[in-house]
Curated annotation (Swiss-Prot):
Pfam families: FBPase, FBPase_C. It catalyses: beta-D-fructose 1,6-bisphosphate + H2O = beta-D-fructose 6-phosphate + phosphate. It is an enzyme of class 3 (hydrolase). GO terms for cellular component: cytosol. It is found in: Cytoplasm. Pathway: Carbohydrate biosynthesis; gluconeogenesis. Its main location: cytoplasm. Its cofactor is Mg(2+). GO terms for biological process: fructose 1,6-bisphosphate metabolic process; fructose 6-phosphate metabolic process; fructose metabolic process; gluconeogenesis; sucrose biosynthetic process. It comes from Acidiphilium cryptum (strain JF-5). This is Fructose-1,6-bisphosphatase class 1.
Length: 355
């Protein structure tokens, strides 16, 4: 489409008008290159080898798939090439310093939804870009122990029927689609806006017996539909791939819930704050949606370590608010989590790219 916004054009304009974001733009451009390679591997399926083969054990004890290792290597190479200062990955036990004069730190989940590799369901790459905060002799984890409000940019690539990028630089959320002919990422539509109301929710309902009371009560109300207190019917959507559910919510609304529960290893939630919850929350808030752990806005949580877990609820603001109210009724107060999306960087025409 001749009138579609090209990602490279968008990044050039942001970098020229807001030099403080130049390093972040370089990272996104480099990650787009890695995403093209990952998309090509996935498109070939078994012709690329047994990408779903278990080749080892991940940090959390799950089986590490072949594609987990491949995507980690590709993304790491891209981040190094971008000139970033530090790199952290779900597939690495500890972060690492890269470039001593780099300006940003990049945290990634190289392959979200790896259980879907062999099923043609969507998988993705999630990233968060933070100020590097150099300090002599500092622990390479230090740049990543900032709240999500400090993110300079964030996004995810999703590999499904098509490859797409959802990205924000703090002034709205844009969705770019990879053109397989030209190799360019193009944005043919306006910035994403998540409707406040919805009738769709995403949660793994098989774990109902393990949930905290506020989540259980909220989901029971939805399941009662028009016969319950809500008076309307809801539909369940669950892809076992957070990027897939997030992409759908950015397009038409909905609420996603991955709460803490009573199972061993799930007491503090399952998703990682730094490189999963924070970037998704940033994207959602910049599209007019909300994200919380049930009590506190995700972007206000202070990480204590790089692989810290947290509960995560995000999506249409009206429904996220209801979850917070459920915690309040249960005597587990939540903090204010609904604020207008920030346009604090929109001092130039950059705002028009995302508005």
């Amino acid at each position: 489409m001749s009138d579609a916004l090209r990602l490279d054009t968008c990044l050039d304009q942001i970098a020229s008008q807001l030099p403080a974001l130049t390093a972040s733009c370089r990272v996104v451009e480099a990650l787009a290159g890695a995403a093209r390679q990952i998309a090509h591997l996935l498109a070939r399926g078994p012709l690329s080898g047994d990408l779903g083969a278990v080749i080892g054990e991940s940090l959390d004890g799950d089986g590490q798939k072949a594609l987990d290792a491949i995507t980690h290597a590709l993304v790491r190479e891209a981040v190094i090439a971008s000139g970033a200062a530090a790199f952290a990955s779900e597939e690495a036990a500890a972060p690492e310093w890269l470039d001593p004069v780099g300006e940003v730190a990049v945290a990634v989940d190289p392959l979200d939804g790896s259980s879907n590799i062999d099923t043609l369901a969507p998988v993705g790459t999630i990233f968060s870009i933070l100020p590097a905060r150099h300090a002599s002799g500092a622990d390479p984890a230090s740049p990543f122990l900032q709240t999500g409000r400090r993110q300079l940019a964030a996004g995810f690539f999703i590999y499904g029927p098509r490859t797409a990028l959802a990205v924000t630089f703090g002034n709205g959320t844009r969705i770019f689609t990879l053109d397989p002919v030209s190799g360019a990422f193009l944005a043919p539509a306006p910035p994403a806006t998540v409707p406040a109301a919805t009738r769709e929710y995403a949660i793994n309902g098989s774990n109902l017996r393990h949930w905290e009371e506020p989540i259980r009560d909220y989901i029971v109300e939805l399941k009662q539909g028009r016969n319950g207190p809500r008076g309307i019917d809801f539909n369940t959507r669950w892809l076992a791939s957070m990027v897939g559910d997030a992409f759908r919510i950015l397009g038409r609304g909905g609420i996603y819930l991955y709460p803490a529960d009573e199972r061993q290893g799930y007491e503090a939630g399952r998703l990682r704050l730094v490189y999963e919850a924070n970037p998704i929350a940033f994207l959602m808030e910049q599209a007019g949606a909300s994200a919380t752990d049930g009590r506190i806005p995700i972007l206000d949580l202070q990480p204590a370590h790089i692989h810290q877990r947290c509960p995560l609820v995000f999506g249409s603001a009206d429904e996220v608010r209801r979850v917070a109210q459920a915690y309040e009724r249960a005597g587990q107060p939540s903090s204010p989590l609904f604020r207008r999306r920030s346009l604090f960087r929109s001092t130039s025409n950059v705002a028009e790219l995302f508005a």
